[in-house]
């Protein structure tokens, strides 16, 4: 690869940088640009109805600033702006934002679209990067700065017209391609714009510093932001905003570090929609904060519904591995991961943890409207813990610990044979085939139990008479023991159908619908190998005897 054709991005000279020692303690001002920056990047931009649906969803999520479009760019954008205002669809506590280039006719059209608005942010921009000055516009620094000043003057002029006297306007300026602009020049241009607007602590202006193209590592962007914050005159009268893109795949980190570096505000989209590789995903950054115990002041407790509405409006698809929102996020294919999750959830249920602490799960899926049933997925790489979790959580079977490896091998083999992931229903189907439906060579037809009380020895025993099918032929057996399980086991030995060693016995109630059944687990040892059997019935004795038959049948098949 021709790596020599690229030049390393320069470092920022910043003495005594402070951002590495800081933590995010509160949410920034969030501004959604889904309806503008996100919409312009769609193969098929949203129509007015889809935009209204998206706008209402953004309001429900909790955004207080929403960039709704570029009203001077098209009739659809203009019509949408007018509809929001005329139909009074903008809540009292929400401010819309519109974008315009620094050209007279575009600024005029923008303000016409805003007639009757209560509050609006007017966002004006021009590119300041060295590359675009030289290659695209062929203008020098003074000429580009002059464009910015004229844009600032125009939006100020129109905002002061009497027809807008009932509206409040906040001004925002972006030196587009800030990350490709010399820092001292970007500062010079922004201060020239602010000198026109003359913001105050009571009436602040917004300076937005976009990584229009992500060009370096997040720490470099943080250095740029801290440098800018420290050098900017009248800083207390300015809301410093970030607008990161994801060309290098690190825009979330850039925005997070930018907040540490002193920024007050963040622009982005849901799920990172935007030009090329996309914008900052505000949902991602907000839930990163949430996972650290910081209130993001945005509501994502119905994340599945948000994903569905987003996909319907944009015709885009949220990736299965997308942080927090993807279908596979709260899943675990690895056996060791599944086992750890199972133990973590059990510990949480028992109240042992004050805070959320579950291995491999950064947040509680329930907080986002997700379900625990989605967590464990079973394939050929899965382990014993995952299959045991599915059997307990989905079907109520609490498999003995020693049974986990055995059943895990059964499921692994089935998954290998089918070459696919197994659903809970398939897992239960294979469980029944392996443990409950195997009737060869033995099958219990009927039995009778008699209690024997030896008064002299103060000992109670049980006598059992049973009819079993052996390879399709009915045979009567009889045995005595300390209980039904022991008696039946001995009865099988008496007929030499057994020859096995009894290892363990477990049982528990099994609730299926409105009926309660008993399930029993028996482990035996035959020729130095151990086998489990399972029985289920309304009667615990029947369940226990069937568990023995199940174990014996499995031992004959191996």
UniProtKB/Swiss-Prot annotation:
Gene Ontology biological process: L-leucine biosynthetic process
State the residue spans of region: Regulatory domain: 438-558
Name the Enzyme Commission number(s) assigned to this protein.
Answer: 2.3.3.13
- Name one cellular component (GO) term: cytoplasm
Task: Name the coenzymes or cofactors required.
Answer: Mg(2+)
Using the UniProt record, give the first listed, main subcellular location.
cytoplasm
Give the superkingdom in one word.
Answer: Bacteria
Write out the residues that bind Mg(2+). Answer: 37, 243, 245, 279
Q: Name one Pfam family in it.
A: LeuA_dimer
Domain Pyruvate carboxyltransferase, first and last residues per copy = 28-304
Instruction: Report the GO molecular function annotations.
Output: 2-isopropylmalate synthase activity; acetyl-CoA C-acetyltransferase activity; magnesium ion binding
Task: State the reactions this protein catalyses.
Answer: 3-methyl-2-oxobutanoate + acetyl-CoA + H2O = (2S)-2-isopropylmalate + CoA + H(+)
Question: Where found, per UniProt?
Answer: Cytoplasm
Subunit composition and interactions: Homodimer.
Q: What is this protein called?
A: 2-isopropylmalate synthase
Q: Which gene encodes it?
A: leuA
